[in-house]
């Protein structure tokens, strides 16, 4: 992954998303995931999601990162699932209102990556 490609997404702002907003197409998924290759598309309960696991030296560092992700979520008005474990945080982005992936999820994933820098 290049920093430049990640910044292309991270510099964007999430748009308000409604129930009738379009999910990303298969073609868009391939293009966008190429900008954030550490993220893995997952399907759970027939819902496509983006997931990434971050590793840390201890619980306190993982906790601090989870708090940063929470602050990002509040600032973007877009909220992921955050699983905090000893030395590990798993972040999962998807758009609840459309039951799948929207461009906002990729923007937030790229911004999440920058929190670790």
Swiss-Prot record:
Molecular function terms, GO-annotated: 4-alpha-hydroxytetrahydrobiopterin dehydratase activity
Known catalytic reactions: (4aS,6R)-4a-hydroxy-L-erythro-5,6,7,8-tetrahydrobiopterin = (6R)-L-erythro-6,7-dihydrobiopterin + H2O
EC number: 4.2.1.96
Keywords: Lyase
InterPro entries found in the cross-reference section: PCD_sf, Pterin-4-alpha-carb_dehyd, Pterin_deHydtase
GO BP field: tetrahydrobiopterin biosynthetic process
Xref: Pfam families: Pterin_4a (PF01329)
Enzyme class: lyase
Keyword Mitochondrion: no
Superkingdom: Bacteria
Bridged cysteine pairs (disulfide): none
UniProt family annotation: Belongs to the pterin-4-alpha-carbinolamine dehydratase family.
PANTHER family assigned to the protein according to its UniProt record, in alphabetical order: PTERIN-4-ALPHA-CARBINOLAMINE DEHYDRATASE-RELATED (PTHR42805:SF1)
Protein name according to UniProt: Putative pterin-4-alpha-carbinolamine dehydratase
